[in-house]
Amino acid sequence: YRNQLVLDLSNPKVQDYVFGVVDNILTENPGVAYFKWDCNSPITNIYSPYAKDKQGQLYVDHVRGIYNVLKRIKDKYPDVPMMLCSGGGARCDYEALKYFTEFWCSDNTDPVERIYIQWGFSQFFPAKAMAAHVTSWNKNTSVKFRTDVAAMCKLGFDIGLQELSDDELAYCQQAIANWKRLQPAIMDGDQYRLVSPYETNHAAVEYVDKSKTMAVLFAYDLAPRFQEKLHAVKLQGLDPDKRYLVKEINLMPGTESKFAQNEKIYTGDYLMKIGLDVFTYLHNMSKIIELKAL
């Protein structure tokens, strides 16, 4: 299977070997600022000469051996961010969060599918644990849509810059700057799943920072039906007594917002009880709305 055999990490000598390989790479290349740990082969021939008569607990011992290696690496290189790649298929768990800064949720980076993946994944892990990259998958969708979907988590890019037009490149640069500015809400704030893609033809997710002075709403139109009823999205987690400036961000160069409530001021109470009209009848469209307390 994949012309690979899985190393027996229940064996301490194998643990030493694996740690040594990674340690040598990082020692010889002190400029390494980030690396990912991939998991590409299942165990298809489970057996360990080291375990002898304890084969029944081999799966557990194997995983504990992996954690031991990861702990040693993290202890020696605490400042090097690590991604647990190939994270789908039950490879993500809370113990691994001790050693990895993020998970790769799935190799499926189609932005439409990612909305569902990220919605489900967020039931268990925070946005800062979910690596989400803009790629060339599903070029029927715009670079804006792909970027706006990835920005809902830990934003990254796996795309050739030569594929982007000047406007698309400028948009991505603007989106990155906005994402960095909104990190207190997206990465460290409270998440509210407002409109489920599993129950509607749209999706909406909101993040609010701890001080309730900054919030960001991600809204997506997936496949709306003809003349379906579009409902306002009622926000959550705001301070009802605060006044918030509502502004659409991440607009393509040369375009203007068509969001009717753009650059208007509302109380948190209004936004949570009445809401914002962010959805449209268009397919695969997105809006990112920033809310700033005044």
Protein language model regions, located:
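C-terminal beta-sandwich/jelly-roll accessory domains of carbohydrate-active enzymes
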Residues: 223-294
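Hydrophobic, well-ordered secondary-structure elements that form the walls
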Residues: 38, 82, 150, 217, ...
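Catalytic cores of secreted or luminal carbohydrate-active enzymes
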Residues: 144-195
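Residue-level detector of short, conserved catalytic/binding motifs and their immediate flanks
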Residues: 80, 148, 215, 244, ...
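Active-site neighborhood of glycoside hydrolase catalytic domains
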Residues: 1-144, 154-159, 163-166
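A general structural signal for short secondary-structure junctions and capping/turn motifs
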Residues: 25, 73-74, 206-210, 235-237, ...
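Structural motif
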Residues: 137-147, 207-212
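Carbohydrate-binding surface patches
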Residues: 196-240
